[in-house]
């Protein structure tokens, strides 16, 4: 049975930590494929800053040289909130012979119990958990730990929120957090001003 990872997010913008997580997941789990799923409107967010077309373009630039990856517009084309279990069910229907994983950050572990339909989701799928800076060892009482595979290496402490703030204040400060092509795209298209 092969492993297919679903990496969902708003990618507003996609940054170096997103790509680092994807590469570490490939290395740790010998994945068949990583599918980046761009959310139209994530359930936990109220606003997007860049148009969906710009977020797709930036993700294509960031993943352009990565093998065994694809970008899915499954959620984006719905034009509404799509819950994680629905996305995983969709990809499970496309890859019924494979094991489906969802990529999350370790900071999301504590929130899992409040995710929509989480018991169903955790019963069918597994999570690839990327360590986030500042998130100490996972509390052993966290629910669903047995459904998690942890990436041992901590990823860079980068957030899309911080990048948007830096671009607005002084775009040169954001350059180290972004793929060079993504950075150039943001500047050339006047995003996050």
Curated annotation (Swiss-Prot):
Family assignment from sequence similarity: Belongs to the NadD family.
Role description: Catalyzes the reversible adenylation of nicotinate mononucleotide (NaMN) to nicotinic acid adenine dinucleotide (NaAD).
Pathway the protein acts in: Cofactor biosynthesis; NAD(+) biosynthesis; deamido-NAD(+) from nicotinate D-ribonucleotide: step 1/1
The protein's name in its UniProt record: Probable nicotinate-nucleotide adenylyltransferase
UniProt catalytic activity: nicotinate beta-D-ribonucleotide + ATP + H(+) = deamido-NAD(+) + diphosphate
Pfam families noted in UniProt: CTP_transf_like
One GO process term, biological-process aspect: NAD biosynthetic process
Enzyme class: transferase
UniProt entry keywords in alphabetical sequence: ATP-binding, NAD, Nucleotide-binding, Nucleotidyltransferase, Pyridine nucleotide biosynthesis, Transferase
Originating species: Endomicrobium trichonymphae
């Amino acid at each position: 049975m092969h492993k297919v990872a679903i990496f969902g997010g708003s990618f507003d913008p996609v940054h170096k930590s997103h790509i680092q997580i994807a590469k570490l997941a490939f290395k740790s789990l010998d994945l068949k494929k990583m599918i980046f799923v761009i959310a139209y409107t994530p359930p936990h967010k109220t606003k997007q800053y860049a148009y969906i077309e710009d977020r797709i373009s930036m993700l294509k630039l960031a993943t352009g040289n990565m093998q065994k990856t694809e970008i899915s517009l499954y959620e984006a084309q719905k034009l509404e909130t799509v819950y994680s279990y629905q996305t995983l069910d969709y990809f499970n229907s496309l890859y019924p012979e494979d094991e489906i994983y969802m990529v999350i950050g370790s900071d999301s572990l504590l929130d899992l119990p409040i995710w929509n339909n989480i018991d169903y989701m955790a019963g069918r799928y597994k999570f690839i958990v990327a360590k986030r800076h500042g998130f100490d060892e996972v509390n052993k009482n966290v629910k669903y730990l047995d459904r998690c595979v942890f990436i041992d290496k901590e990823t860079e402490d980068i957030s899309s929120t911080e990048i948007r703030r830096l671009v607005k204040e002084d775009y040169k400060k954001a350059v180290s957090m972004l793929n060079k092509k993504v950075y150039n795209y943001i500047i050339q298209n006047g995003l996050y001003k």
